[in-house]
Structures are given as C-alpha cells and as structure tokens.
Amino acid sequence: MSLLDTLQRGLADLDAQGLRRVRRIADTACDARMTVNGREIVGFASNDYLGLAAHPALVAAFAEGAQRYGSGSGGSHLLGGHSRAHARLEDELAGFAGGFSDAPRALYFSTGYMANLAAMTALAGKGATIFSDALNHASLIDGMRLSRANVQVYPHADTAALAALLDASEAETKLIVSDTVFSMDGDVAPLAELVALAERHGAWLVVDDAHGFGVLGPQGRGALAAAALRSPHLVYVGTLGKAAGVAGAFVIAHETVIEWLIQRARSYIFTTAAPPAVAHAVSASLKVIAGDEGDARRAHLAALIERTRALLRNTRWQPVDSHTAVQPLVIGSNDATLAAMRALDAHGLWVPAIRPPTVPAGTSRLRVSLSAAHSFDDFARLEAALIEASEAAA
C-alpha cells in the first residue's frame, strides 16, 4: 500500500468517527463579532480573553514597530535577530510577572509550543525524572518525550499521588510540570500544594500559564500572583497570543536558568526570531493589561463567566466546574457534540466541538471561550441558542 493510500484510509477513518477537523477562514480581525467563511458570526472560539487582538493601541504599536524595525528579524536571536524591542519586552515581562523570584529574568519565544519544548528539553535529560499532570498540554508532553527524561504521570490534580511518586523517586533532578489553567476543563491546578511539594522534595516546578496570564491575579500578573506564591524553585511559562492579544511566549525563572536556556534550548537557538514589531506590540499590550482598562476588562469578563456558569447548569449536558474564561460543556459522543455545534452555528454562533484525542473518548464537548469583547447581548444570544439546542437534543 502506498503512502497516499495509507493517508487516505486514515482520513476516511477520521470521517467515520466524526473526528476530522476543518479550518474556518476569518475575513476580519479576531473579535467577538467577526466575518468567518463569509458569514457574520459571534465567536466563542478564540483565546482572546481580554479582547485585545484588535485593540487600536496594539494595532498602532504593531504598525509603529514595523516602521521602526522592518517586517522581519532577519535571523535567530543569537545571530543578528535579537532587537531592542525583544530585549525591552523581556525586561518588562520579568518585572511584570516575575514576582515569584528574587532574581527573575525573562526569555521571549516565538510560540508557546517552542517555550514549553525549551523548558522540558533544556532542564531535564537522561537521569532526570519529570512528574507530569495527566491533563498537561500537548506541547509539554512532546517536550518531555524529546528530553529523554524518565516521565511519571500522576492523575489530574492529585497531589497525594504526586507526593507518593516523589517519595519513591531517587532521581537527582526532579521536575514537577503542570498547566495552571487546564485548557479543556478550565480548572486551576493546586499551585500552592505543588510549590510545597517541590520545595519539600528538592524538585523544580514548571508551570504553563497560557490561559491565566493577563487574566488571573492582580493586574493580570498570572496564576502565581493570584495565589501569592514565591519560590526559588519555579519556572513560569506564559503565552502572548491569548489574553495579551498578540503572539509569542516567554519563560521567566532565576537568571541562571534563563542563561542556561539561551545556551542550550534548541527551540530558542535554531529558529528565526519573531519580527520585532510583534515584541513592540506586546509591550503596548502589557500597558493595557496592567492599567485601569485591563482591570475593567477583567471585571467584565468575570461577570460573563458567572452568567455562563449559571447558563451551562441549566442545560441537559454536563458542565465542568470552571471559574475561568474556558467554560466546557461535556456532551459525550462525537456525533452529538457536532450536532450541537451545528445547531449553534445556525444561530450565527461559533462554539467549537472538542473531540478526541484532545479530550478522552466519550467526553466530547462544546468549549465556550469567553472574552471581555463579548457584550451581554452576545451572551443573551448564546443563552437562547444553547437552551434551544439542549432541549432539542433531549
């Protein structure tokens, strides 16, 4: 059988299981109301939690950065591509989100995937043991595989099981790895307990705050700040394409850890740096996030979250107990979830169906992603359509 035959058979299998993914094409900027595939829709699919992706100040900063630095970086960070905009942003990020460390330093990456690969592969290797939450993001899992470290997976958020694994470990280097906000459930990791376990066992804790940075904590400083945690054993990863509304990611840790990543993280060294204009726009985003406007947007988002939690409890399906902008509604089968998605789409609402392998088999779900850009009128449309779809499925 040829490769094409094998691939075609695999695609047919995906179709039969209701698992083929289809891209939609946005014709306008990411916002609550968009034109997608030529239709006006209200989107509940993006990770633009603060509604900053089309913010005029960020758009202007992006254009200003392109005028000043050009359209591309021209090289890797170590070979000519590291601009003043990148360096300034790293200093700003360390000051903004590095309060957990006495000597924080930040390192900017082009994507969150690359940042997580860097943390896993450069900090762990043969002889090390990584203790991973069962629901960690795919980028962390891929990084663990590439690291060649021993990986032990503990049940989701089960700190007792994690403690038992740590007690039994004789590894010299131990890394506990966890998302902060889990992207498909919306729940928050038991961070205080994880920090305590790391310190008790001489381990390091690596947290991926992709869905918390900009939203959680005072001024949006993230999940660690929300829990008022400080520790010399922390490595903090955050992304800049979700609440921050631009692109890229970062790692913040003790300055020695960051210097090691610069020297040894292959996903940092062997790739072209992101355009400086992107970093320039992120600097503008941080000003909005940390200011009064950021506080107002987080307050509006919090109100939407509470309304959505109440709404999901009134459907026939199973809501997940989430207090974040990620509001899942577990339906079960792939076909039923796709049918619910199509019913909402008929009302001009884009609420994506999340299916295996992203979530376990039998737990396919709608994932309502909320944004400060949503109005209460947008929520009312979602409420009416979701109740109708739920009743029709009964």
Swiss-Prot record:
Give one Pfam family, short name only. Aminotran_1_2
Which InterPro entries does the UniProt record give? Answer: Aminotransferase_I/II_large, AON_synthase_class-II, AONS_Archaea/Proteobacteria, AONS_Proteobacteria, PyrdxlP-dep_Trfase, PyrdxlP-dep_Trfase_major, PyrdxlP-dep_Trfase_small
**Keywords, comma-separated and alphabetical:** Biotin biosynthesis, Pyridoxal phosphate, Transferase
What catalytic reaction does the record list? 6-carboxyhexanoyl-[ACP] + L-alanine + H(+) = (8S)-8-amino-7-oxononanoate + holo-[ACP] + CO2
Please name the source species: Burkholderia cenocepacia (strain ATCC BAA-245 / DSM 16553 / LMG 16656 / NCTC 13227 / J2315 / CF5610) (Burkholderia cepacia (strain J2315))
| N6-(pyridoxal phosphate)lysine PTM positions | K242
Kindly tell me the pathway this chain contributes to: Cofactor biosynthesis; biotin biosynthesis
Q: What does this protein do?
A: Catalyzes the decarboxylative condensation of pimeloyl-[acyl-carrier protein] and L-alanine to produce 8-amino-7-oxononanoate (AON), [acyl-carrier protein], and carbon dioxide.
Note the subunit structure: Homodimer.
Could you give a single Gene Ontology term from the biological process aspect? biotin biosynthetic process
Q: Name any one GO molecular function.
A: pyridoxal phosphate binding
Q: Which PANTHER family match?
A: 8-AMINO-7-OXONONANOATE SYNTHASE, CLASS II AMINOTRANSFERASE/8-AMINO-7-OXONONANOATE SYNTHASE
Q: Report the EC number(s), separated by commas if there are several.
A: 2.3.1.47
Family note: Belongs to the class-II pyridoxal-phosphate-dependent aminotransferase family. BioF subfamily.
Q: What is this protein called?
A: 8-amino-7-oxononanoate synthase
Superkingdom = Bacteria
Q: Which coenzymes or cofactors are required?
A: pyridoxal 5'-phosphate
- Transmembrane regions: none
